[in-house]
């Protein structure tokens, strides 16, 4: 009886020691892994059941789990730094908003100002030789066009194109950190469980650690160890860990381990499939546009943390989602969207008119320079003709006039005014050609109520454009902001309807 009491006391002591060690392990999980930081997100992982066949808990040290956790959190933190949320690249000053690239914006102003200064200072005074009214009209027309050009240029460059406000970036960062911690706990538990199962497969820890020779006492010891293990690992709050007592035979241990591995792999595969389905479902939202059969897919923007509204796209240069995004214009240094497309269209059209005007007037001035100037070679020829007027023929007159005109043109090109005329003619021709293609392209887009990126991606290629309401109504919408409420909806609100009237 005394021996049995001593053995029972030893068994109880061992149970108490195991319970204390298991409590310490639970504290390690709570303090270092951060299991209880986000109870809402923890529910996503409560359905994962891990089956663990445990031996003697004395074989495991307290620092093993914490070391595994620290390694896994470091890996996840490195991934989080790579996916760090970038801030917007747009520049804000009171109500002025512009993009980050300002070098080409300065070049655009130089391309407009330099030819204009040469034209106003050097060439417009030549029109006085033709007519006084022509000189005054040149000053009025050129200055008026320059005012319209720079007004639309600066308004387009410093107007908010329709940037969609982001969700709170700090909250999204905290959510990502919490998710990485939960993923780290998952990896740590998997490593801890698989390492324990490998040890059990090699030998029987409980039978080797038993200090008693009687079979009855061994049975009592095994029952005590299994009950204490179940009590200590019972529903930790995030994961359900089931403890099973191994049998004495190694064959049964290996069979149980194989079955447990298969069950765990099946559960993991099912959970991965469910997570992938949830990601695919939450990546897009389909919305029907008006009464048409066209369904617009609103994509979720990871950077801005919101669902993009119809016809909205993310600009990689400014790092913003923009309403009715058309394109990012490098020459203006800003995105072209719902709020500044009208000014962009007016800018390119007025610049085209100005380039054509400079081209035509430079040709007129060059003709005037050629007619009013006479080369020294022509003066010598005229003196020779006057001295030999008796031998003068009509056939020679045509040749002499042609030679005179060529000599006068070559001589005029050597002068400052003639060289500037040639420069402005070449510059105006190139700018008129490029801007002519650009303006004609945007006229076609305006009449069909499409944007540049929609035409480039061919979104409405195989179906009718639901936003096309006729060329007259499209002109009112695009160029006069008449009833421009295509995107008057908050797609990120759960209470919004899936039917948008265009």
From Swiss-Prot:
Composition skew (Acidic residues), residue ranges: 59-73, 213-222
PROSITE patterns: DHHC (PS50216)
Molecular function (Gene Ontology), one example: protein-cysteine S-palmitoyltransferase activity
Disordered as annotated region, ranges: 1-80, 200-281
Active site residues of this protein: 329
Signal peptide: none
EC number: 2.3.1.225
Biased composition (Basic and acidic residues): 10-30
EC class (word): transferase
Keywords: Acyltransferase, Glycoprotein, Lipoprotein, Membrane, Palmitate, Transferase, Transmembrane, Transmembrane helix
Family: Belongs to the DHHC palmitoyltransferase family.
Domain remarks: The DHHC domain is required for palmitoyltransferase activity.
Protein name: Putative ZDHHC-type palmitoyltransferase 3
Protein source organism: Dictyostelium discoideum
Taxonomy of the source species: Eukaryota, Amoebozoa, Evosea, Eumycetozoa, Dictyostelia
């Amino acid at each position: 009886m005394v021996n049995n009491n001593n053995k029972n006391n030893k068994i109880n002591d061992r149970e108490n020691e195991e319970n204390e060690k298991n409590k310490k392990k639970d504290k390690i999980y709570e303090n270092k892994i951060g299991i209880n930081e986000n109870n809402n997100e923890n529910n996503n992982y409560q359905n994962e059941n891990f089956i663990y066949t445990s031996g003697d808990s004395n074989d495991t040290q307290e620092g093993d789990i914490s070391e595994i956790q620290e390694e896994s959190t470091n890996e996840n933190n490195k991934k989080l730094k790579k996916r760090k949320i970038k801030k917007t690249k747009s520049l804000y000053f009171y109500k002025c908003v512009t993009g980050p690239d300002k070098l080409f914006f300065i070049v655009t102003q130089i391309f407009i100002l330099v030819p204009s200064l040469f034209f106003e200072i050097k060439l417009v005074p030549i029109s006085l030789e033709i007519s006084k009214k022509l000189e005054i009209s040149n000053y009025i027309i050129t200055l008026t066009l320059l005012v319209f050009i720079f007004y639309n240029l600066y308004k387009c460059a410093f107007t908010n194109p329709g940037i969609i406000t982001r969700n709170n970036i700090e909250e999204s960062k905290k959510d990502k950190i919490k998710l990485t911690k939960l993923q780290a706990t998952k990896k740590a538990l998997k490593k801890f469980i698989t390492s324990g199962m490998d040890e059990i497969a090699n030998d029987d820890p409980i039978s080797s650690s038993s200090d008693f020779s009687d079979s009855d006492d061994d049975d009592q010891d095994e029952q005590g160890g299994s009950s204490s293990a179940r009590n200590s690992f019972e529903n930790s709050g995030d994961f359900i860990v089931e403890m099973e007592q191994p049998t004495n035979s190694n064959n049964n241990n290996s069979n149980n381990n194989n079955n447990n591995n298969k069950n765990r792999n099946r559960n993991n595969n099912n959970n991965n499939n469910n997570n992938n389905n949830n990601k695919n479902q939450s990546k897009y939202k389909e919305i029907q546009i008006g009464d048409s059969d066209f369904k617009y897919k609103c994509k979720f923007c990871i950077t801005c943390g919101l669902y993009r509204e119809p016809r909205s796209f993310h600009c990689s240069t400014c790092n913003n989602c923009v309403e009715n995004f058309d394109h990012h214009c490098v020459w203006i240094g800003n995105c072209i969207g719902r709020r500044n497309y009208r000014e962009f269209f007016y800018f390119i059209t007025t610049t085209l008119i100005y380039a054509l005007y400079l081209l035509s007037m430079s040709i007129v001035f060059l003709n005037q320079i050629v007619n009013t100037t006479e080369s020294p070679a022509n003066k010598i020829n005229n003196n020779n003709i006057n001295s030999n007027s008796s031998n003068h023929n009509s056939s020679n007159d045509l040749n002499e006039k042609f030679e005179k005109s060529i000599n006068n043109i070559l001589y005029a090109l050597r002068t400052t005014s003639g060289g500037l005329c040639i420069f402005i003619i070449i510059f105006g021709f190139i700018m008129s050609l490029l801007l002519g293609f650009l303006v004609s392209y945007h006229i076609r887009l305006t009449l069909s109520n499409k944007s540049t990126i929609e035409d480039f991606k061919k979104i409405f290629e195989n179906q009718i454009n639901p936003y096309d309401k006729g060329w007259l109504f499209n002109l009112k919408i695009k160029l006069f902001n008449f009833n421009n409420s295509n995107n008057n909806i908050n797609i990120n609100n759960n209470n919004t309807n899936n039917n948008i009237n265009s």
